[in-house]
């Protein structure tokens, strides 16, 4: 069987990684799927971070 085109990726908050003084400890992570053929670069979306308590950029991690 052929490998599927869609893969599951994890998005991590960029501000939580670099900022230590925030509302609560931890790093916000989301999982989503992306099409490997259409989006070859790393995915970056604005999502709500519960630790920062605001909308921030979330980048794809390995």
Swiss-Prot record:
Q: What is any Pfam family matched here?
A: Ribosomal_L33
**What InterPro entries does the annotation carry?**
Ribosomal_bL33, Ribosomal_bL33_CS, Ribosomal_bL33_sf, Ribosomal_zn-bd
Keyword Ribonucleoprotein, does the record have it? yes
Keywords associated with the record? Ribonucleoprotein, Ribosomal protein
* rRNA processing among keywords: no
- What GO cellular component entries does it have? cytoplasm; ribonucleoprotein complex; ribosome
Q: Where is the signal peptide?
A: none
Q: Name one GO biological process term.
A: translation
GO molecular function term, any single one: structural constituent of ribosome
- NCBIfam families (UniProt xref): PRK00504.1, PRK00595.1, rpmG_bact
Could you say which protein family the record assigns here? Belongs to the bacterial ribosomal protein bL33 family.
Q: What is this protein called?
A: Large ribosomal subunit protein bL33
- Report the source organism: Acaryochloris marina (strain MBIC 11017)
Gene name per UniProt: rpmG
């Amino acid at each position: 069987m052929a490998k599927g085109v869609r893969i599951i990726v994890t998005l991590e908050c960029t501000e939580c990684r670099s900022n230590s003084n925030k509302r609560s400890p931890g790093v916000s992570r989301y999982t989503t799927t992306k099409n490997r053929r259409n989006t070859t670069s790393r995915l970056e979306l604005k999502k709500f971070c519960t630790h920062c308590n605001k909308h921030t950029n979330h980048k794809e991690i390995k």
